[in-house]
């Protein structure tokens, strides 16, 4: 199954222990407590479950769901 914007938001929220509705699409996720270890864990899961080919550096450079969507293959 393809990764979706909702799926990314849900996964990020779960990683942070937050409600998905509290995670904006366009905000810097570092400001919400996302760190490099969590980014790596999220990316690992997406690679296994959705065959994502994004690089950690690309996600770390642009830490927002909106910026990640095209990198993760969400159209």
Describe the function of each predicted region:
Residues 1-2, 6, 33-36, 62:
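Short, solvent-exposed loop/helix junctions and linker helices
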Residues 1-21, 41-45, 49, 70-75:
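Thiotemplate assembly-line natural product biosynthesis machinery
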Residues 13-32, 49-57:
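Phosphopantetheine carrier-protein modules
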Residues 28, 63-66:
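Short, structural beta-strand-to-alpha-helix junction motif
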Residues 37-63:
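Phosphopantetheinylated carrier protein domains
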């Amino acid at each position: 199954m393809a990764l979706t914007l909702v799926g990314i938001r849900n996964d990020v929220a779960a990683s942070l222990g937050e409600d998905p509705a509290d995670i904006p699409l366009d905000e810097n996720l570092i400001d919400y407590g996302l760190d490099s270890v969590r980014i790596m864990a999220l990316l690992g899961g997406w690679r296994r479950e959705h065959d994502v080919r994004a690089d950690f550096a690309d996600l770390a450079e642009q830490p927002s769901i909106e910026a990640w969507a095209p990198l993760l293959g969400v159209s």
